Amino acid sequence: MENKVTAYSIYNKKAKKNTKVNPLDEVFPQLPRKKYQVIYADPPWDYGGKMQYDKSTIKSENEGFKRDIFISSASFKYPTLKLKELQQLDVPSITADDCILFMWTTGPQMANSILLGESWGFEYKTVAFVWDKMVHNPGRYTLSQTEFVLVFKKGKIPTPRGARNVRQLLQIHRGQHSEKPYAVIDGITKMFPALDKIELFARNNFVGWDNWGLEIPDNKIEIPTQGEIDENK
């Protein structure tokens, strides 16, 4: 009997080749020896190698399928981490007595995100930002179109504060995989312009911020100006 080719058999073959691996001996690089009042984090959540579908590449392997298969996973783009691994990160060592944490999450990782924030010594407060990506992905229940930035607090809200009119809803077209809109870090900067701030799992090197991660550019740049509403929608 001829073996049936399935989407998962294609994925499993690609996964071993494409999965990104942390190049460090330790799970994490060394954190700064400094206390921060503002922390902005985009944890590299592990989704168990979840496949994504799209009418796109690997056309030679799409024969016999009703729709084209696009083999992709977060783990193909960067090293991902499970909740227990993220909880090992010694964030408490860099938090001031009064500190606020802004953390990116998705619907499936909402509960884990709250557990992670609590394990780092914070109390969950609310949703700071809702990002409408202006395009939907397949979802198990409804079509997925949003990501969220949760806000956690340790002690009191740090002072001095800046802007009090930063909008929660951002309607901005998504960019590259896992790329987040600049409007979020710009908004946080406006809310807390004078405080010590650090971006965890950073891929940028912005003026006014310290950063930590595996993919940080050498040169500092200004935060690009980006409106809360995408004019190209």
Curated annotation (Swiss-Prot):
GO terms for biological process: DNA restriction-modification system; methylation. InterPro entries: DNA_methylase_N6_adenine_CS, MT-A70-like, SAM-dependent_MTases_sf. It holds the Pfam family MT-A70. It is an enzyme of class 2 (transferase). The keyword Transferase applies. The keyword Methyltransferase applies. It catalyses: a 2'-deoxyadenosine in DNA + S-adenosyl-L-methionine = an N(6)-methyl-2'-deoxyadenosine in DNA + S-adenosyl-L-homocysteine + H(+). Its EC number is 2.1.1.72. GO terms for molecular function: DNA binding; site-specific DNA-methyltransferase (adenine-specific) activity. Keywords: DNA-binding, Methyltransferase, Restriction system, S-adenosyl-L-methionine, Transferase. Belongs to the MT-A70-like family. This is Type II methyltransferase M.MunI. It comes from Mycoplasma sp.
